[in-house]
């Protein structure tokens, strides 16, 4: 949600109206977050404090809930040693996955809680045969615009290095999170949804995961991605928007907007098309050559 709905303690302009449009039109929606620390109830309170009301815990799906769903679906009798905070502990408890500090079958890693003592115990449990599961692959998570802290991915990588065992990473971009989200949306709509739109600000997680799950992938430029870097990726978003505010009228009217509808736009909203070995930008009929960006492999 950070970078799509809010930045730090401020709503992105137009985000409140966007959410209001979803609610007033009865459009099924779900907020996905890789942050395993908060509970859905925490997120309801946070967004209400920022100025968005009318939300309920059912509107949020965290990587902690995703990990709990995965374990209860694939290994319902498992136990877990948890490195994480309230959101992860609550999600596992709701799914009747016991917290075991003696002989766990899983070490589950989320955000926070990675003390020297806990890391030492986790190392021992993994060496004894426990499987390592991370709620998400993020190496860091934001605390403020100037401060970050280690994420679940960093803690899992530490344990991978110390034990020589590989972790399984859930959360975005893992398809399991997107398929579970689609299922939840279909349940809310009381029918199987043929088309689902994922709106996100990160190419590596939001856009990649949505594409691999067969969803429409809308990239917003209100967060971490700069337009200049979009062409570096093999996969491309379905649409690029300045922010979620560009979607509000479409949701209200049910009619697609002509604005920002091509595969790629530059940072000013001008159409960018691919011509052979170079990119060109169309600005009022004037074509300015752009160097071809390097493609990732």
What do these predicted regions represent?
Residues 4-27, 36-61, 68-272, 279-281:
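Asp-based, Mg2+/Mn2+-dependent phosphohydrolase catalytic module
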Residues 167, 288-291:
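A generic structured-segment signal
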Residues 293-296:
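Short, intrinsically disordered C-terminal tails of secreted or membrane-associated proteins
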């Amino acid at each position: 949600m950070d970078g799509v709905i809010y930045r730090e303690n401020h709503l992105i302009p137009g985000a409140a109206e966007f959410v209001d449009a979803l609610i007033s039109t009865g459009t099924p929606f779900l907020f996905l977050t890789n942050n395993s620390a908060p509970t859905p109830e925490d997120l309801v309170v946070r967004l209400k404090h920022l100025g968005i009301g009318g939300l309920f815990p059912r509107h949020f799906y965290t990587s902690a809930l995703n990990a709990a769903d995965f374990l209860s679906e694939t290994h319902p009798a498992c136990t877990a040693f948890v490195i994480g905070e309230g959101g992860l502990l609550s999600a596992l408890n709701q799914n009747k996955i016991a917290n075991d500090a003696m002989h766990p079958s899983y070490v589950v890693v989320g955000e926070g809680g990675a003390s020297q003592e806990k890391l030492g115990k986790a190392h021992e449990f993994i060496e004894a045969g426990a499987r390592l599961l991370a709620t998400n692959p993020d190496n860091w998570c934001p605390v403020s615009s100037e401060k970050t802290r280690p994420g679940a991915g960093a803690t899992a990588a530490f344990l991978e290095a110390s034990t020589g065992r590989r972790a399984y990473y859930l959360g975005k971009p893992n398809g399991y999170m997107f398929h579970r989200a689609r299922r939840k949306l279909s349940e809310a709509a009381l029918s199987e949804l043929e088309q689902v739109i994922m709106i996100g600000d990160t190419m590596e997680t939001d856009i990649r995961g949505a594409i691999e799950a067969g969803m429409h992938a809308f990239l917003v430029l209100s967060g971490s991605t700069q337009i200049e870097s979009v062409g570096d990726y093999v996969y491309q978003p379905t649409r690029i928007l300045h922010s979620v505010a560009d979607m509000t009228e479409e949701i209200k009217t049910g009619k697609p907007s002509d604005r920002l509808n091509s595969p790629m736009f530059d940072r000013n909203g001008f159409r960018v098309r691919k011509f052979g070995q170079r990119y060109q930008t169309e600005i009022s009929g004037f074509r300015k050559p752009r160097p071809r960006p390097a493609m990732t492999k």
